């Protein structure tokens, strides 16, 4: 929070969103943190370099105005929930699902098995209040591939219904980072929680994307991070 007070966390965000549009300053401040505390540097990177940047680069105006102020001020500590226990860096094969329910206009986020736990996620074990969760989007019975969703995890430090989290335990280093596992049991989120810069689901469940090819859409989303 001292870094927030000193405006050291906002370099990389646009001015209209309370940032300074200074990527060089963002990189320099991140590099300098290693001189003080390597765990703090990684926590910094998770909050503003992964969680915040995913909302900025994969979301649209609604997400920017609704979520980014809390991210930049650290009112909403967050996680970047991509890696899974059984899938590692094979993001295209992740098992977490987000199935659209047109009756309620909600996505249902679910972890189908132990291999699909989000694992070694920074901020997950203790501090994370929300996460950008990568999941297979299902709508109208079809799998549209991996998409990113804003998913609340905790409220005032307590896990929300259906959200599970455990600490990954002691590591060989960087033990100031609360790496943990995340899993979801039929967690419902609003339709607007889909970070929809490249694709969207309409209220009736119909899916649309400016990138027709599923593979190209997948790599475009990853490349935007």
Predicted features, each with a name:
Residues 1-75, 126-127:
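Internal helix-loop-helix
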Residues 11-15, 32-36, 48-52, 114-118, ...:
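Glycine- and acidic
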Residues 54-57, 84-89, 116-117:
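Sensory/regulatory domains in signal-transduction proteins
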Residues 63, 104-110, 155-158, 183-197:
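Long, well-ordered alpha-helical segments
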Residues 69-89:
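Internal maturation/activation junctions in enzymes
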Residues 102-164:
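A short core secondary-structure module
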Residues 169-225:
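Glycine-rich beta->alpha junctions and the first turn(s) of the following alpha-helix
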